Amino acid sequence: MQPLQNAGYDRAITVFSPDGRLFQVEYAREAVKRGTTSIGIKCSEGIVLAVDKRTTSNLVEATSIEKIFKIDEHIGAATSGLVADARALVERARVEAQINKITYSEPIRVDSLSKKLCDMLQMYTQNGGVRPFGSALIIGGVYDGICKLFETDPSGALIEYKATAIGSGRSAAMDIFEDQYKDDMNLNEAINLALTAINEATEHETTANNVEIAVIKCGEEVYTKLSQEEVQTFIDEVVSEEESEEESEE
């Protein structure tokens, strides 16, 4: 039996509850919280996007699971939540990037793309016959040498971050960022920090098979996904550092 205060107000997306809540939007946020962990970090040398893409079965081909997407040459996105919803948002973002390039003969700005996407997300919270997207995105990119990192929300809210996380491991990851993030860290340090956060969120079950990492360097402004071998090298570094810290504490 549903709580009396929720009765009737969680059925229609366009109806506020007496205390000013849209329950369908809150339920969409819960779908994001149940997703795997995705990380975004802005550093002095560029943007790092990292995701946990663990599967529920050994029969699933790991290469078929995609949680990081290339939006444009200089922009990438990491997702969490309902996979199909995330794919639809990514396709819309790609279309917006293409429209901007055709119309203005230049790449789209990271903040402009993020705002356009969130404008659409917001429309899905106030129209009948639709539902909010049960997915959130971390959008990162470099434009004119300036790094930008944004987090979207099913409500259409848009927040710029230095480092952020979405999904089931958000709390653990954000605690690590609060403690270890530095504005002047280089790309390798940012990758190690992202892996440390994912390792904590996954209870130290991180492997090159279930982690995906993409970077966008300030100088090049080109989205690049790391190979499994490169990811494993960084994982080995993180594990080695954690073991050294444990030994020093003893």
Swiss-Prot record:
User: In which compartments does the protein localize?
Assistant: Cytoplasm
Q: What does the entry report regarding how activity is regulated?
A: The formation of the proteasomal ATPase PAN-20S proteasome complex, via the docking of the C-termini of PAN into the intersubunit pockets in the alpha-rings, triggers opening of the gate for substrate entry. Interconversion between the open-gate and close-gate conformations leads to a dynamic regulation of the 20S proteasome proteolysis activity.
A GO CC term assigned to this protein in UniProt = proteasome core complex, alpha-subunit complex
List, alphabetically, the SUPFAM superfamilies matched: N-terminal nucleophile aminohydrolases (Ntn hydrolases)
In its UniProt record, which GO terms are filed under biological process?
A: proteasomal protein catabolic process; ubiquitin-dependent protein catabolic process
Judging by the UniProt lineage, the source's domain of life is: Archaea
Record keywords: Cytoplasm, Proteasome
Xref: InterPro entries: Ntn_hydrolases_N (IPR029055), Proteasome_alpha (IPR050115), Proteasome_alpha-type (IPR023332), Proteasome_asu_arc (IPR019982), Proteasome_asu_N (IPR000426), Proteasome_sua/b (IPR001353)
Q: Which Pfam families match?
A: Proteasome, Proteasome_A_N
Q: What is its main location?
A: cytoplasm
- GO molecular function list: threonine-type endopeptidase activity
Kindly indicate whether the keyword Cytoplasm belongs to this entry.
yes
Q: What assembly does the database describe for this protein? A: The 20S proteasome core is composed of 14 alpha and 14 beta subunits that assemble into four stacked heptameric rings, resulting in a barrel-shaped structure. The two inner rings, each composed of seven catalytic beta subunits, are sandwiched by two outer rings, each composed of seven alpha subunits. The catalytic chamber with the active sites is on the inside of the barrel. Has a gated structure, the ends of the cylinder being occluded by the N-termini of the alpha-subunits. Is capped at one or both ends by the proteasome regulatory ATPase, PAN.
Q: What does this protein do?
A: Component of the proteasome core, a large protease complex with broad specificity involved in protein degradation.
Q: Which family does it belong to?
A: Belongs to the peptidase T1A family.
Name the chain's protein: Proteasome subunit alpha
Query: Which gene is annotated as encoding this protein in its UniProt record?
Result: psmA
